[in-house]
Amino acid sequence: MRTPKRTRSPKTKVSLRGETLTLQLTTVSLDTRHMVKRCDERHGRPLPHSQESQHGSATSKKAVRGTADTAPLERISAARGWALPMEATVSVFRAHQWQWN
C-alpha cells in the first residue's frame, strides 16, 4: 500500500516595516479572533484592540509582535478521509503608542 505523498504548500513573503516574515499557505481556515483570545488567556494579558491601532496609518504607526502562540491544526484529505496533524504559529501584532515630549 502506497503512502500519500506529502506536498509542500507555497510560501509567500510579507514585509512589515523592514521585517520580513515567511508565511506557509495552507488550505486550513482558522478563526483569528479565537486565536487572539487564546493568546490573551495563555499570556495573562489582553492586547489593545482600539480603532486607532487597527486602522492606524502605516507611516505613523510601528507594529511590533505582542504575543506568539502555537495551535494544533488538522488538514483533512477528502479523497482518502484522513487527517494530517499540523502546527501553526500565530503572531499577534499591536501598534506602538507615540509619546510626545
UniProtKB/Swiss-Prot annotation:
<protein>
    <recommendedName>
        <fullName>Putative uncharacterized protein LINC02906</fullName>
    </recommendedName>
</protein>
<feature type="compositionally biased region" description="Polar residues">
    <location>
        <begin position="50"/>
        <end position="60"/>
    </location>
</feature>
<feature type="region of interest" description="Disordered">
    <location>
        <begin position="39"/>
        <end position="74"/>
    </location>
</feature>
